[in-house]
């Protein structure tokens, strides 16, 4: 028959050994809770920063991730006091805390994977000059006001033009107005376009990573001089590339 705790004489070697074991278990529990808390805090801070950065592009996380991959943000801090001497309640609290931290870390991993496929880089990594922005401008050929659904960057002739996120090449050839142009599908509704290239260095169907070379800067098509015309398209609609490039500076610095 197992001996009850109440039957063990106070001050006996057995009682001392049990007390030491309980103290060790309590200390271990406290250390685990502290580690979980630190993990959750770091993940929450990084997740919060990435959400703010994505918001600066004009999009929210709910636009980009399925609901199943977004942690329940209602899960906040607080709750009843649970005495660690009651290990049954303490164990329950530990598993609840671990589950909450796990949800947040899973969401962070999903967001960081998503970031790899959002065009947040610049199409030129060499020294360049911004020459024309997104929106209404005076057309350089006709002098009339017209929409410009991209950004223009000038640089040295044949400078490498690079992919602004991982993706798959869906077009590599000539288009009216664009000259030699490359289009990349990044998934999640994002497509980027690189126009007026001197030379194309990728083929349709090719997978590319961020900053992989897709062509060389040139002046083909409707162009007044060497530059790359760069577009960001989300679900078929043009977006201002500047917002994505500026957001990317914070992502890659982080």
Name the predicted role of every residue range.
Residues 108, 117-254:
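Catalytic cores of peptidoglycan-degrading enzymes
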């Amino acid at each position: 028959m197992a001996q009850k705790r109440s039957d063990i004489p106070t001050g006996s070697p057995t009682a001392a050994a049990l007390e030491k074991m309980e103290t060790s278990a309590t200390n271990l529990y406290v250390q685990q809770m502290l580690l979980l808390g630190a993990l959750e805090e770091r993940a929450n801070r990084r997740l919060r920063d990435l959400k703010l950065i994505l918001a600066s592009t004009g999009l929210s996380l709910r636009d980009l991730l399925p609901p199943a991959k977004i942690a329940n943000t209602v899960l906040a801090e607080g709750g009843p006091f649970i005495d660690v001497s009651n290990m049954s309640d303490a164990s329950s609290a530990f598993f609840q805390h671990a589950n909450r931290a796990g949800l947040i870390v899973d969401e962070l991993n999903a967001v960081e994977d998503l970031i790899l496929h959002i065009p947040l880089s610049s199409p030129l990594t060499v020294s360049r000059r911004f020459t024309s922005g997104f929106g209404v401008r005076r057309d350089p050929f006709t002098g009339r006001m017209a929409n410009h659904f991209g950004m223009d960057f000038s640089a040295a002739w044949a400078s490498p033009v690079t992919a602004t996120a991982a993706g798959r090449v869906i077009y590599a050839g000539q288009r009216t107005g664009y000259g030699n142009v490359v289009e990349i599908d990044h998934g999640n509704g994002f497509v980027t376009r690189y126009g007026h290239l001197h030379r194309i260095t990728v083929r349709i169907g090719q997978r590319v990573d961020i900053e992989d070379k897709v062509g060389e800067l040139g002046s083909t098509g409707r162009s007044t001089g060497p530059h790359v015309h760069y577009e960001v398209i989300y679900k078929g609609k043009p977006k201002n590339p500047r917002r994505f490039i500026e957001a990317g500076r914070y992502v890659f610095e982080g």
